[in-house]
C-alpha cells in the first residue's frame, strides 16, 4: 500500500511558482493558486508594445504545465502558517507552503488584471502600440532595465530617418546612473552610449511626481490610460518637458497584502519575507518563499525566481524524506548579474562585478528572443490563448 502524497500549496503562478510546481508535480499533491488565467511572460512585454502580435506568445496557458497537480484561479486574501483563504471563501491547507506572490509594477510590464478576455488583451496591446506609433515625443518615467529595454525597442521599430528624429524620447530617472547603481562602469557606459546613439535625452537625479490615479493603477495592477495628449511636464527640479505620451516604468511593489498579518515579524520594510538560504521563511520549517517576495539581496529577475524554485523544490523533497534542515539545498546569493537587451540585435550582460559580455553574446542569450520560446517550452508548449 502506497502512502498518500504530501500536499504542496503554491501561492502564485509566476516564474518561480510555475517552476517549483513543475519540479514537484510527480512526487507531491501540488495545488497552485493564481489570480490570472494565463502565465504572463513579462520579459517579452517591452517588445510586445511595439509588436502587438507577440501578445499571442507572451500570454501562455497553464493547462499543459502539470500532469498531476491542479490550478485554482482566484485571489488569496490571507495566508497563515496553516492555511490560505481565498476571496471566494475557500480555505486550503497544506503540508508544505510556497509563497510566490511576486511584485506589482504598472501594465503593460505586468499583466493588466482588468483585461481578462483574449480580445481585451490583444486590443490593449494594439492600442498601446498605436499610441507609440503616433507619438512624436515620449516621456519615459524611470530609467531602470525596463525603461532602457523599452526605449531600445521603440527606436528599433521607429529609427532615425534622413537624419531626422522620428520621435523625441526623454528618460527621467531618480538615480545617478541608468539601470542600477550596482552595475559596473563598463555596463553603465555601454548603456549610456546606447541611449546617446539612439538620440534619447536622459535626465538623471530627478523625478516626475506620480499622480494619484497612477498610484491606484499600481496598487491594483490595472492599466494606466494610454492616449496621445500633448502635455507639458515639470520635473521636481524644475526641468520642463513636452511630451505627447508618458509611460511609467517605476513603482515596483511587493505583493505582501495576503501574508503581512500572520508573518509580520518576518517581513522587512519592503514587505519582503525574511528567508534562509534554503528559501524557508524564518522560523517556519514547512513554509517557503521564492522570487520577488523574498528578502535576498539580489536583483528580482525571472532567472533568480526560477533558481529559488529549484532550491525550494529540492528542500521540500528532502524534508519529505526526513532530512534535517542542515542537509537542505542552499541558495548562493548572486552579485549584480543582469542581461539587458537593447533591441533585438544589441545588449550587454554583466556576469560578475568586473566582467561583462558584449552585444553578440547578449543577442544570443536574450535580445533576439527575450526568452519567449524558452518559457513556452517551460510550460510544455500549450496551445496559444490568442489565435
Curated annotation (Swiss-Prot):
Keywords: FAD, Flavoprotein, Oxidoreductase. It holds the Pfam family Pyr_redox_2. Its EC number is 1.-.-.-. It comes from the Eukaryota. SUPFAM superfamilies: FAD/NAD(P)-binding domain (SSF51905). One of its GO terms (cellular component) is cytoplasm. Its cofactor is FAD. The keyword Oxidoreductase applies. GO terms for molecular function: electron-transferring-flavoprotein dehydrogenase activity; flavin adenine dinucleotide binding. Gene3D superfamilies: 3.50.50.100. FAD binds at residues 12-16, 47, 292. PANTHER family: APOPTOSIS-INDUCING FACTOR 1, FERROPTOSIS SUPPRESSOR PROTEIN 1. Putative FAD-dependent oxidoreductase. Belongs to the FAD-dependent oxidoreductase family. This is Apoptosis-inducing factor homolog B.
Amino acid at each position: 500500500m502506497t502512502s498518500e502524497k504530501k500536499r504542496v500549496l503554491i501561492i502564485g503562478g509566476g516564474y518561480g511558482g510555475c517552476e517549483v510546481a513543475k519540479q514537484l508535480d510527480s512526487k507531491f499533491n501540488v495545488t497552485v493558486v493564481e489570480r490570472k488565467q494565463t502565465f504572463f511572460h513579462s520579459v517579452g512585454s517591452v517588445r510586445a508594445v511595439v509588436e502587438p502580435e507577440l501578445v499571442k506568445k507572451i500570454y501562455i496557458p497553464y493547462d499543459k504545465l502539470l500532469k498531476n497537480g491542479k490550478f485554482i484561479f482566484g485571489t488569496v486574501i490571507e495566508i497563515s502558517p496553516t492555511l490560505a483563504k481565498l476571496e471566494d471563501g475557500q480555505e486550503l491547507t497544506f503540508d508544505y507552503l510556497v509563497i510566490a506572490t511576486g511584485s506589482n509594477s504598472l501594465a503593460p510590464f505586468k499583466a493588466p488584471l482588468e483585461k481578462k478576455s483574449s480580445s481585451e488583451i490583444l486590443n490593449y496591446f494594439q492600442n498601446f502600440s498605436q499610441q507609440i506609433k503616433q507619438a512624436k515625443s515620449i516621456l519615459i518615467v524611470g530609467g531602470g532595465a525596463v525603461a532602457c529595454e523599452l526605449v531600445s525597442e521603440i527606436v528599433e521599430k521607429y529609427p532615425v530617418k534622413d537624419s531626422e528624429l522620428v520621435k523625441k524620447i526623454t528618460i527621467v530617472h531618480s538615480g545617478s546612473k541608468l539601470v542600477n547603481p550596482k552595475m559596473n562602469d563598463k555596463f553603465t557606459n555601454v548603456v549610456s552610449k546606447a541611449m546617446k546613439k539612439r538620440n534619447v535625452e536622459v535626465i538623471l537625479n530627478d523625478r516626475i511626481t506620480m499622480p494619484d490615479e497612477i498610484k491606484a493603477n499600481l496598487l491594483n495592477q490595472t492599466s494606466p490610460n494610454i492616449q496621445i495628449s500633448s502635455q507639458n511636464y515639470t520635473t521636481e527640479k524644475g526641468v520642463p518637458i513636452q511630451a505627447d505620451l508618458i509611460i511609467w516604468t517605476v513603482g515596483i511593489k511587493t505583493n505582501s497584502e495576503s501574508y503581512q498579518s500572520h508573518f509580520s515579524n518576518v517581513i522587512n520594510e519592503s514587505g519582503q519575507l525574511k528567508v534562509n538560504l534554503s528559501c524557508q521563511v524564518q522560523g517556519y520549517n514547512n513554509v517557503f518563499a521564492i522570487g520577488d517576495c523574498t528578502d535576498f539581496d539580489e536583483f528580482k529577475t525571472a532567472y533568480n525566481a526560477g533558481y529559488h524554485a529549484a532550491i525550494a523544490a529540492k528542500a521540500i523533497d528532502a524534508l519529505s524524506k526526513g532530512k534535517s534542515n542542515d542537509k537542505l539545498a542552499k541558495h548562493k546569493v548572486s552579485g549584480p548579474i543582469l542581461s539587458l537587451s537593447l533591441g533585438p540585435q544589441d545588449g550587454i550582460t554583466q556576469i560578475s562585478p568586473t566582467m561583462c559580455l558584449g552585444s553578440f553574446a547578449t543577442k544570443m542569450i536574450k535580445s533576439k528572443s527575450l526568452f519567449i520560446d524558452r518559457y513556452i517550452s517551460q510550460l510544455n508548449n500549450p496551445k496559444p490563448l490568442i489565435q
